[in-house]
Amino acid sequence: MREVNFSIPNVNKASVNITTTLYDRRALDCTSTLPLINSLNHLAYLTTSSARIRDILTVDGGIERLVCILKEGRSRDLMEMWKWSLAFQCVVNIGVRGSESVRTRVVEADMVPVIATILDNYIKVVDKARARADSESQRQSSRHHSKAVPTSNDASGRSSFLEQSSTAEQRTSRRHAPPPSIEIPPQPFFQENHVADSNVLDVASPPRVPMTSPPERSTFGQDVHHHRTNEGRFAHGNHRHRMQPLATALPSMDAADGFGLRPVRDNERLPSMLPGFHTGLTSQPDSPTTPNAPVQPRSSAQATIARQRPSLRQQQSASGESDDGNGDGSTMDEDPASTEAAEPIVGLQNRMDIDDVGERDTILGGVSDSHDLTVTDPSEEQEAETFNITHRSTVDGSMINTDNAQNNAALGLSPTQAADNANSPALVPSPYSLYFRDRTTTAAHGVLTTMPRDEDVLMSLQLLAYVSKYCNLRSYFQHSHFVPKLKIDRELQMLEEGTSPIDLPEEEDEYLLPDDVNIFPLVEKFTVRHHSKDMQYWACVVMRNLCRKDESRGGIRQCAYYKCGKWEEFQRQFAKCRRCRRTKYCSKDCQKAAWVYHRHWCHTTP
């Protein structure tokens, strides 16, 4: 048998590969990156469309080989990243679209540690970005506060001075007669100065716009007139009279108004009256192919405001959305009497009410303060029920054809512009990737290339939602570990400012690590509002699967508090949460401790 890397020059590919019509297990053992990417690209399509291929992968060791590719870790090399993403996509396709036996094989192939590491890395990056953003905002606010105190005093002094001066000017204008209007010189004088004015007329100026400011602004800067001679004033006034008659710019007023009209010089105009400012405020076309205009000076301030996000407590008070799968948190102030009357809970001698939980204000206050977010979540405005499991290629502002995107997702196509993902914005850029992208350090870009994408987290949560509903597999989720080669602790350590890079301890072999990681607490963190709604939805599905009864053990349930894990000795031994009637707790202490995160996925049952 020939080597799997043996190439055929006339077709420029490996001799053993996977196509859309042929599956060969030997192609997955290829050690060359490029032919392996080609095979994985076609395998992604096959795992999406063919149930037979998914079944074959569970018995020929294909799933184990794909998981081994994932455990090798993500690299900064473009081709390696592409290979890793395609292998991950294949495993997700097998687990999501496969049968119960196929999903069981995915879990038994040790895919849960890979998912746990991806979720843990994302949480660490989120916490790092939020911590740095909070520290910078506090530093800027303290600096702004120190500068704002003297500025406010000076501003108040200047404003009082201006008010007094304006009052004095108004009183003076009431007492004295209005100043005489400027007379236009006779025609012979204009002819004598025609040569001098012709030089001024040679300079083309933009068309003047009608002045919409009140007539009082025409007297602004009267002290400038004292520095000019009468001849210059007449010549300038005559020039303005020829270029733009004042009668066309201002509405006509009678002589009884109290003052006459005179031309307005450019140095007397307010900034809002200058033609250059009006031309700069013209609306730009909204065509996606038209390049944007240069950023105005105030756009940076607007961008800063746009990238800020209200805290979790403010969102709870301002949000009017329902408490469904989108993941909006619920409060504990509702009276559950009506809910109990509609569907009473049976077999509960030690009934526990959510409203009876003590010290709820302290718990909720601590959670709200600890989950404030200072970065924007761009996916909140999207109401997508599905997601594209392929790479999201970079865009330049042009319109996206949704039909083509869906076809690419079905075919498992990969992008050709993935090389720019670390430096250019994606279709829906993560707020945390935007935060690190603004940092031009090498460490920040290293985190960008190794950190999980939003698509990776979303696919991980979706895969967990499909495989976690089988109670016989729950031990795989509650006793797992992290993959050493997938962890990004070294990259996160390099982000610390003012600290020298330290050598982290050498990575241990994975088989030596204890299975002491429970994946459900990691998933529960994605039910908090500052994550996207899709992440909240699938995380809530996973947490509700934790509350399923185990029919193989007589229909008993497990305590929903992850640190407890106690099982019922008989049916209906534990009390249900009175609000959602899904979770069960063995005691009030477990219920109070679990409410910190359970409140984010505790949805009222109709």
Swiss-Prot record:
> Tell me, what does this protein do in biology?
Involved in determination of the onset of polarized growth and morphogenesis. Plays a role in the regulation of branching in hyphae and spore formation.
Q: Which domain of life is it from?
A: Eukaryota
Classification of source organism: Eukaryota, Fungi, Dikarya, Ascomycota, Pezizomycotina
The terms under GO molecular function for this entry are:
zinc ion binding
Q: What is its main location?
A: cytoplasm
> Which PANTHER family has this protein been placed in?
MYND-TYPE ZINC FINGER PROTEIN MUB1
Task: Output the Gene Ontology cellular-component terms.
Answer: cytoplasm; MUB1-RAD6-UBR2 ubiquitin ligase complex
Single GO biological process annotation from the record? sporulation resulting in formation of a cellular spore
Q: Which family does it belong to?
A: Belongs to the MUB1/samB family.
Q: Which InterPro entries match?
A: ARM-type_fold, MYND-type_zinc_finger, Znf_MYND
Q: Which stretches of the protein fold into MYND-type zinc fingers, per the record?
A: 561-602
What is the name attached to this protein's record?
MYND-type zinc finger protein samB
Q: Where is this region: Disordered?
A: 134-188, 203-225, 262-352, 365-384
The residue stretches assigned to a coiled coil in this entry are none
Binding locations of Zn(2+):
C577, C580, H598, C602
